[in-house]
């Protein structure tokens, strides 16, 4: 896998000049036909600057218009209109949820942005029957889904660490967190989707109905359609969570304990690990501790320049089951090889745990440390290569530098559906590794991007077999390498559902009106 060298060089050049990546192209006249479309919602043609921003704060590509849909029909009408303009039109369309893309993936330069959050509110419906589920808009935030389903004592099974993301947004990628080892990513926990394709067709799909589109859209990076509704299976929600953290000095014990836990039948409900290279850094970011007594914060665990590893786990319980929970937790802890004096735990409500990152977000916003550039790197590493990777990256590349939390935890391949579009390593266990950097100032951004490049370059040369999660490439060769043997299937699905390459241009996979994507006869 070759890294996006050209992309990094462009970013570094622009940052050296003191700015972020902003594309300024001559403003074309907005097609008057857009204004003539009959809609339940409306277009904005002037106040569009917010749609040119994202969480990454590294790219800004202004659209020509923003659609605030009042219905799914508005989205279909708009996409169908652009489709009928034909292959010679340069107009593209991107669905934007809560704007948490990192490198402009949810943007559309001089195109149309669909503000998906306009679709939320009165569209959620919970069915609490024998096989409970919730129907949620693609623009609904997961935190709102949680609040609504908890009214029925129910909740989805699989989550992301941060809940202020849209349903359609995470399902277009994968949606991973500490529950993934058991339940799989969020894309493995979907019963049905409603999708508006690149032709403007509204299609309901599931594993049994229009299954190819269903699996294409899950993890499909928005390339095959706009997810306007998802049916998510639910399970009984616990009232409380026992939240634990322990520390390790030895990477082998740290990873072996994690692998043992994710393979056990009786285990914790959530398992994540993170790497602590710079203790000061870990205290000033969104993964900061839940309590001053947390071992990550405790002064008695000064690392003397050594890398520390923290294992974070939870056990769900209801108050009347506290004694049983205690026994189960103690049994599990007795099998682990952490530093005995580093154990810390606290009991919190289920929603307090799931929404933990938002609590840190509020503190960082108050300090002006949230809306800063986030040059993140998210990768997936085969289990067989994790020690080779860690030795070089944590021992050398990042030895003296860390601008944010580093997550590292294993998951089971058996919980992922290989019919979806997401790309994962071909091993039964693989690791999710996330370098979640915050960067203040052009020099810091440049430094972090350089570290990201060095990590990818090393992984490529050493044959680590890394796959990017939330992939960020700029050339067809890079995308072809990313998808490997699945590239042909991905291309064929694109031709079937978005033949003019109208959708999600910010992913930079296909160019509109490309000769390789002809209109079907």
Curated annotation (Swiss-Prot):
Note: Plants over-expressing CKX9 form short culms, increased number of tillers, decreased number of primary and secondary branches per panicle and have a very low seed setting rate.
GO molecular function: cytokinin dehydrogenase activity; FAD binding; oxidoreductase activity
Location of the protein in the cell: Secreted, Extracellular space; Cytoplasm, Cytosol; Nucleus
Induction: Induced by the synthetic strigolactone analog GR24.
Family annotation (PANTHER family): CYTOKININ DEHYDROGENASE 9, GULONOLACTONE OXIDASE
Any Gene Ontology biological process: cytokinin metabolic process
Family membership noted in the UniProt record: Belongs to the oxygen-dependent FAD-linked oxidoreductase family.
GO cellular component terms attached to this protein's record: cytosol; extracellular region; nucleus
Signal peptide boundaries: 1-22
Catalytic reaction list: N(6)-dimethylallyladenine + A + H2O = 3-methyl-2-butenal + adenine + AH2
TM region positions: none
Organism (species): Oryza sativa subsp. japonica
Residues linked to a glycan: 57, 278, 412, 418, 472
InterPro entries reported in the protein's UniProt record: Cytok_DH_C_sf, Cytokinin_DH_FAD/cytokin-bd, FAD-bd_PCMH, FAD-bd_PCMH-like_sf, FAD-bd_PCMH_sub1, FAD-bd_PCMH_sub2, FAD-linked_Oxase-like_C, FAD-linked_Oxidoreductases_BP
Any Pfam family: Cytokin-bind
Name of this protein: Cytokinin dehydrogenase 9
Cofactor: FAD
Subunit field text: Monomer.
Binding, FAD: 95, 97, 99, 101, 105, 161, 166, 172, 176, 227, 469, 507
Chief location category: secreted
Domain FAD-binding PCMH-type: 59-237
């Amino acid at each position: 896998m070759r890294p996006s060298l050209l992309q990094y060089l462009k970013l570094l050049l622009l940052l050296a000049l003191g700015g972020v990546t902003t594309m300024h192209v001559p403003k074309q006249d907005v097609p008057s036909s857009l204004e003539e479309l009959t809609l339940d919602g409306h277009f904005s043609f002037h106040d569009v600057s917010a749609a040119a921003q994202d969480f990454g704060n590294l790219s800004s590509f202004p659209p020509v218009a923003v659609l605030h849909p009042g219905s799914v029909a508005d989205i279909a009408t708009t996409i169908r209109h652009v489709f009928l303009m034909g292959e010679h039109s340069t107009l593209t369309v991107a669905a934007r949820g809560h704007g948490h893309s990192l490198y402009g993936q949810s943007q559309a330069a001089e195109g149309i942005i669909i503000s998906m959050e306009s679709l939320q509110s009165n569209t959620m419906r919970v069915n609490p029957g024998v096989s409970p589920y919730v129907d949620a808009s693609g623009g609904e935030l997961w935190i709102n889904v949680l609040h609504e389903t908890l009214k029925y004592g129910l909740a989805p099974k699989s989550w992301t660490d941060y809940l202020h993301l849209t349903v359609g947004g995470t399902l277009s990628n994968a949606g991973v967190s500490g529950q993934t080892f058991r339940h799989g990513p969020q894309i493995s926990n979907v019963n049905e989707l409603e999708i508006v394709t690149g032709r403007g067709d509204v299609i309901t799909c599931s594993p049994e109905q229009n299954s190819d589109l269903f699996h294409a859209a899950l993890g499909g990076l928005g390339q095959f359609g706009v997810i306007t509704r998802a049916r998510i299976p639910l399970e009984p929600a616990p009232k409380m969570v026992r939240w634990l953290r322990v520390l390790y000095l030895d990477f082998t014990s740290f990873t072996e304990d994690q692998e043992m836990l994710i393979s056990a039948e009786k285990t914790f409900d959530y398992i994540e690990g993170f790497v602590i290279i710079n203790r000061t850094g870990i205290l000033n970011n969104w993964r900061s501790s839940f309590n001053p007594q947390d071992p990550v914060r405790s002064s008695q665990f000064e690392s003397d320049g050594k890398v520390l590893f923290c294992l974070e786990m939870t056990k769900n319980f209801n108050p009347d089951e506290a004694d049983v929970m205690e026994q189960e937790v103690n049994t599990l802890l007795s099998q682990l090889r952490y530093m005995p004096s580093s154990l810390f735990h606290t009991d919190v409500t289920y929603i307090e745990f799931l929404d933990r990152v938002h609590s840190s977000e509020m503190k960082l916003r108050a300090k002006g440390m949230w809306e800063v550039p986030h040059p993140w790197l998210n990768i997936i590493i085969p289990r067989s290569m994790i020690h080779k990777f860690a030795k070089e990256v944590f021992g050398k590349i990042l030895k003296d530098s860390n601008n944010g939390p580093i997550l590292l935890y294993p998951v089971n391949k058996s919980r992922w559906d290989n019919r979806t579009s997401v790309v994962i390593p071909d091993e039964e266990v693989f690791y999710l590794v996330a370098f979640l950097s915050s960067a203040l100032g052009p020099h810091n951004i440049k430094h972090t991007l350089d570290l990201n490049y060095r990590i990818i370059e090393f992984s490529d040369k050493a044959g680590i077999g890394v796959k990017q999660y939330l992939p960020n490439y700029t050339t067809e060769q890079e995308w072809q390498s990313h998808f490997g043997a699945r590239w042909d299937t991905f291309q064929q699905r694109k031709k079937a559902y978005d033949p003019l390459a109208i959708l999600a241009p910010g992913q930079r996979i296909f160019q509109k009106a490309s000769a390789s994507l002809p209109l079907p006869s």
